[in-house]
């Protein structure tokens, strides 16, 4: 089962100093438990659901920032910032890592900085600067005074994206912020900001226009009054590639701490820098000789395809920016994704730049050579060079963090679970169920929901089934050996897990008059859906809906063009990312003939006869509905054939509100049901429970939300799920586990069986005993790894049967439970906590006393205490009430797929 989840304004290049009224920092202090408002029963109930993070971390995710305290020697402490996974810290040189960003409102990081004069002071700028099609928005800048343990939001919330944070070398209260502003729209809160009071107030000291922000900012290490700032005109529109060049882009310098600025790319200066059609600029100032400044400059001379030629390159100044010379025409492509340059602190001629490869120059940028990056992921974004040892390097790329201690000849990967999942499914035909999902630039991976190992679930338990940018994946319910998976722009393969035979089944030209190749318009993420009614049929979304039969060997097109491509929204300048494509597909679990599609430009179609005829129902939404946004998810109801749920994701239109709808009549009318969701976290996916039709889940840009009343009210689910985008959800039918994929912190799992059993009256009852999920009996497999402390290990769920009950009031003596055989023989006594709310007790599938030995049977005490598979009953007695539930104990299944546990 798989569920998914404006015209440009004229530019004014003249910089304007426009300090606005002082902006106050949002302290966001948390009340202590003694003063907090009392929690209602439902809040306590929902907070009791704790998620397990399964990773994986074999490949991590995009790392955008590195920050290492200046200690005067080798630093064992450093921080990394992830595109979607928050801030992580190591205090032992990278052996182990700890997430320190749970106090942040979002987990997308643009830059990090540690105060040189006080290494406890750490700043985090939220909102990635790389302007990727799948990036998320920030909510300003945060400050920690205790090395990342606690954070305070210091304002600038509407900047949405931070390019650089620069801290004064001797005064930690003086901080500069290079803010890019909104990626998907125009806004005035962008530019260079300065605080002199530690972030309590801010002044905007440099501003160009409401489409131009600042992507880089560098300080002269010998004079903190001298700074260089790189302005970047950028704007994405809808689903397209961005417009990344414009009159606002340029290079600026101040010599008085931001009071006045000089535009170094002014054509009148004739100083050797390019001055027209500028794009992204990266900057670096030499530590040993601060008069030496490098700039990587993107220049577009009218080329409309960003993957083709660009004119610009690496420029160097030896006089503090007065004059420049082009030393190399090297430019990383595409420029919206890379453009930073780094200088060896001990040698201004030793320069590194990032691109799909890590490039090194030893002659001042005249020539670059790719570093030896064997067995290292590509696409680089951050680099730190040890001032005391230039052989010691740390890099951040799309695969995570790597450390080298020999100048880049060999690298060590840091295991940090910051994977950026687009989709997730569960394969319930295997027991325990398997989880598969596609990750940004890290392929498609599958792994177990639990193992027999006492250690837990390791990265070795996961296995890749595809490469590239991992997208959608499907496994037929009746064939766990076949995996269909896709990668960017419509590519599709079929993998046989028994033989590892892979077949490319991407649809090519259908008509004799068409050229071979890809005649359809594929989106970046192409949806794939295996029919619930016929496992040999797949559906694939392009600008048409494509039906694939015979396991993908044949295909035909169902219906018309299901996008606005032929009607409106012409692709804007520099349109690289494909647009006008089906983004979500749904099939009714109750009828194979009812199919839905939703496109990335807002169209919704439905058929009730298997695709013979279609109705476009986009105009049926209530007035004010954002019907030109991405249709992120359509979920057909498990309970009513004519019912469906729909989510619009509008952040690509600079709209960050939730947009969730329901239809009861195949799209003829729709009602909005997302009004109780947070107003600034968007909406990404919706999921209807197959047991309880009033139970819905929604994924937002900062977590998962649940409604128990069909959408009238919403609550956040769980306490420990990070504030991270939830793009997809799936449910294990046997275990009643909700599997959540996040775009930045990997996969998370929680059991939602008690939620499915919720009723209006349950919370008013003094006590309730919930149904118990099947439990597995097995001998734990002891593992004795000697690989050290570094590898990531995810916890298994508790071994045994998890018994869940609800108490309305405190029971000082706790709760007594008894386990019996189906025949009524008592075999185990248990005691559970008596606190109000939802409580859990795990029966470890053993008896109170070992059973008698039998001839030829087991002899160890552990084996004699262990119960056999079969039916058992748990009974809870309290205050003259007695409740009982069945427990199904199953043997651990035979290993049907040899590589799985």
Please provide the spans of the model-predicted regions.
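Sec-dependent N-terminal signal peptides
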Residues: 1-11
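Beta-propeller blade termini and top-face loops
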Residues: 12-791, 798-801, 806, 810
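Glycine/proline-rich low-complexity spacer/linker segments in large multi-domain proteins
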Residues: 240, 247, 855-870, 893-895
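Beta-strand-rich binding/interaction modules
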Residues: 493-495, 803-804, 811-824, 828-829, ...
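Intrinsic-disorder/low-complexity, polar/charged segments enriched in Ser/Thr/Lys/Arg/Asp/Glu/Gln
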Residues: 798-804, 838-840, 882-884
């Amino acid at each position: 089962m798989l569920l998914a989840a404006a015209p440009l304004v004229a530019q004014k290049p003249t910089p304007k100093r426009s300090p606005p009224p002082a902006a106050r920092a949002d302290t966001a202090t948390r009340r202590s438990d003694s003063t907090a408002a009392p929690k209602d029963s439902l809040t306590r109930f929902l907070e009791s659901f704790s998620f397990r993070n399964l990773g994986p971390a074999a490949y991590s995710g995009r790392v955008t920032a590195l920050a290492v305290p200046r200690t005067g020697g080798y630093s064992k402490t450093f921080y990394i910032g992830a595109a979607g996974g928050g801030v992580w810290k190591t205090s032992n040189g990278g052996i182990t890592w700890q997430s320190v960003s749970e106090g942040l409102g979002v987990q997308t990081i643009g830059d990090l900085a540690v105060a040189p004069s006080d290494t406890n002071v750490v700043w985090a700028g939220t909102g990635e600067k790389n302007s990727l099609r799948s990036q998320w928005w920030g909510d300003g800048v945060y400050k920690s005074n205790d090395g990342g343990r606690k954070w305070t939001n210091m304002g600038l919330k509407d900047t949405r994206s931070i390019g650089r944070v620069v801290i004064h070398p001797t005064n930690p209260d003086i901080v500069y912020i290079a803010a890019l502003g909104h990626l998907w729209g125009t806004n005035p809160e962008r530019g260079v900001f300065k605080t002199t009071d530690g972030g309590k107030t801010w002044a905007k000291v440099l501003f160009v226009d409401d489409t131009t922000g600042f992507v880089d900012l560098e300080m002269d290490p010998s004079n903190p009054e001298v700074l260089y700032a790189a302005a970047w005109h950028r704007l994405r529109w809808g689903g397209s590639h961005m417009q990344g060049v414009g009159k606002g882009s340029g290079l600026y310098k101040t010599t008085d701490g931001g009071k006045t600025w000089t535009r170094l790319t002014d054509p009148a200066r004739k100083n050797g820098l390019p001055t027209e059609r500028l794009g992204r600029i990266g900057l670096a100032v030499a530590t040993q000789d601060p008069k030496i400044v490098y700039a990587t400059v993107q220049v577009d001379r009218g080329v409309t395809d960003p993957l083709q030629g660009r004119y610009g390159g690496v420029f160097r100044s030896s006089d503090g920016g007065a004059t420049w010379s082009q030393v190399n025409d090297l430019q990383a492509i595409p420029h919206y994704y890379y453009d930073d340059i780094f200088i060896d602190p001990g040698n201004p001629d030793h320069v590194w730049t990032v691109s799909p490869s890590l490039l090194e120059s030893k002659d001042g940028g005249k020539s670059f050579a790719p570093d030896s990056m064997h067995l290292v992921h590509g696409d680089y974004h951050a680099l730190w060079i040890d001032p005391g040892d230039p052989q010691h390097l740390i890099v951040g790329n799309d695969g995570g963090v790597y450390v080298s201690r020999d100048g880049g000849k060999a690298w060590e990967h840091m295991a940090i679970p910051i994977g950026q999942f687009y989709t997730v499914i569960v394969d319930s035909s295997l027991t325990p169920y398997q989880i598969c999902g596609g990750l940004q630039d890290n392929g498609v991976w599958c792994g177990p929901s639990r193992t027999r190992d006492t250690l837990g679930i390791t990265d070795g338990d996961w296995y890749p089934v595809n490469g590239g940018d991992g997208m959608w994946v499907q496994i037929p319910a009746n064939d766990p050996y076949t995996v269909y998976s896709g990668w960017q722009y419509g590519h599709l393969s079929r993998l046989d897990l028994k033989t590892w035979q892979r077949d490319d089944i991407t649809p090519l030209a259908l008509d004799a008059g068409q050229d071979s190749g890809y005649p359809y318009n594929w989106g970046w993420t192409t949806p794939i859906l295996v029919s619930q009614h016929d496992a040999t049929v797949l559906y694939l979304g392009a600008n048409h809906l494509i039906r694939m039969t015979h396991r993908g060997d044949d295909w035909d097109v169902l219906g018309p063009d299901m996008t606005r491509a032929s009607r409106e929204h012409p692709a804007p300048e520099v349109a690289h990312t494909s647009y006008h494509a089906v983004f979500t597909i749904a099939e009714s679990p109750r009828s194979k003939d009812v199919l839905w599609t939703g496109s990335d430009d807002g169209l919704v179609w439905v058929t009730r006869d298997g695709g013979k005829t279609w109705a476009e129902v986009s105009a049926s939404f209530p007035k004010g509905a954002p019907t030109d946004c991405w249709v992120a998810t359509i979920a057909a109801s498990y309970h009513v054939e004519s019912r469906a749920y729909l989510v619009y994701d509008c952040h690509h239109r600079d709209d960050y509100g939730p947009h969730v709808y329901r239809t009861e009549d195949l799209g003829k009318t729709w009602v909005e049901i997302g009004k109780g969701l947070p107003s600034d976290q968007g909406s990404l996916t919706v999921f209807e429970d197959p047991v309880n039709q009033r139970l819905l889940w929604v994924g937002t840009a900062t977590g998962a939300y649940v409604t128990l009343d069909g959408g009238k009210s919403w609550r956040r689910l769980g306490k420990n799920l990070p504030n991270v985008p939830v793009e997809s959800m799936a449910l294990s039918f046997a275990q009643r586990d909700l599997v959540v994929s996040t775009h930045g912190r990997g996969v998370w799992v929680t059991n939602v069986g008690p939620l499915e059993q919720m009723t209006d009256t349950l919370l008013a009852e003094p006590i309730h005993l919930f149904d118990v999920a099947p439990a597995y009996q097995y001998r734990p497999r002891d593992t004795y790894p000697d690989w050290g402390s570094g590898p990531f290990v995810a916890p298994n769920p508790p071994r045994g049967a998890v018994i869940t009950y609800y108490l309305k009031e405190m029971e000082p003596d706790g709760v007594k439970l008894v386990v019996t055989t189906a025949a009524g023989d008592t075999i185990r006594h248990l005691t559970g906590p008596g606190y109000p709310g939802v409580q859990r007790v795990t029966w470890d599938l053993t008896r109170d006393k070992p059973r008698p030995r039998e001839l030829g049977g087991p002899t160890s005490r552990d084996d004699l205490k262990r119960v056999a598979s079969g039916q058992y009953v748990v009974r809870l007695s309290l205050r003259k009430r007695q409740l009982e539930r069945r427990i199904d104990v199953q043997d651990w299944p035979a290993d049907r797929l040899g590589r799985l546990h």
